[in-house]
Amino acid sequence: MSIQTPEQLIDRLANDLAWRKKELSAMKSLIEAKNVSDKRHKVLLRSGVCILYSHWEGFVKLAANSYLEYVISQKLTYQKLSSNFLALAMKEKLKKAKETHKASLYIPVCEFFISELNQRSILPKPKDVISTGSNLNSEILKEITYILGIDFSIYSTKSPLINTQLLKTRNEIAHGEDSVFDRDEYLELHRDIIGMLDIFRNQIENAAIQKKFRRDSP
């Protein structure tokens, strides 16, 4: 079912984040358990980092795609879209013109800006826009926030955590390296990632409620 109201968007985000938090909570409980061998505890920590990353990437992608789906469902004209979404709509037109190096292909682009802004907008499908490449680092997150028109500065101080503690460690584990990660490091990482997921969810919900996708939003 397509998302056509802020309430539907909020419900989708709430339901998705709920099961992710439940699974992460279960993993955290296993890692905090005292009655496990050091060998098993190491396995749990390595598994925990991988699961933590999967939910970080999974929720950001779902939330971003869901918001874009909601914006598309509003069927706004180009002139009513905020700058970030207008840029997204124009991306393919400009890309085709640039790739051919033919000046003639810029003529339709110019005509669009002159006479077609009052037409109903056509935005690309969410799956063609939001891509993490299975490596959701801080730069990719920044690009996603720019596409959606939400604030990245909240995450800027978390870049080392995202890029090194989470992504680099997860990649090392996934590639079979014997990375060392202790309980306290994991628990701190768990808290920080849960916090960022909540922030991202709130940003998406607020953007929808406040109609930040519209040029005339307050």
Language model features: what each stretch is:
Residues 1-47, 78-84:
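Charged alpha-helical initiation segments
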Residues 2-25, 139-218:
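Polyanionic, low-complexity intrinsically disordered segments
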Residues 28-36, 64, 68, 178:
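Short, flexible helix-adjacent loops and helix caps
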Residues 32, 70-74, 192:
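Residue-level signature of transmembrane alpha-helix interfaces in integral membrane proteins
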Residues 33, 61, 68, 183-186, ...:
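A generic "cationic amphipathic patch" detector
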Residues 40-52, 56, 181, 185:
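Conserved aromatic-histidine-acidic binding/catalytic patches
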Residues 51-52, 59, 64-155:
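Helix-loop junctions and short alpha-helical segments
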Residues 53-61, 65, 191, 195-198, ...:
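A broad, structural surface signal
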